[in-house]
Amino acid sequence: MNRFFFYFIIFYLISFNLYSKDNLKFFNLGKENFKNKNFDKAKINFEKDIVRNTKNQESYLYLAKIHNIKKNNPEFEKNLNTVLLLDPKNEEALYLLIKKKIKDADYDIAKSKYDLFKKICSNMCLKKEEIKKLLKKNKS
């Protein structure tokens, strides 16, 4: 019985490891295609990654960037909101959403997201002034 249990655990660990590598495969392929500006292939790979790992916020962020490049605003915003649902303090997603809301003249949401961005920024703090100027310029 102990031997069966031991083999079962080994089999489980090996299959879990293979499954994890398969997940990373699609994400890494997506990043590579995105880097090479092959956005259609990148989109497919990120979508495949999301099917396997629904909580990978990076895949949603890359999808948002792809939809932004392709001027597909509803999908761009939907993917940004998904990133923020998974990680409300994701600076890049907040920054992109703030810029979109300013562009859409939705200043109340842009301001509330900017207030959150100011509190949590650690990597993109230099963008605070840019957003502040955009809010001031477009609101007046």
Sequence positions of predicted segments:
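Canonical tetratricopeptide repeat
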Residues: 28, 62, 96, 130-134
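Register position in tetratricopeptide repeats
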Residues: 35-36, 69-70, 103, 134-140
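Canonical positions in the second alpha-helix
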Residues: 48-49, 82-83, 116-117
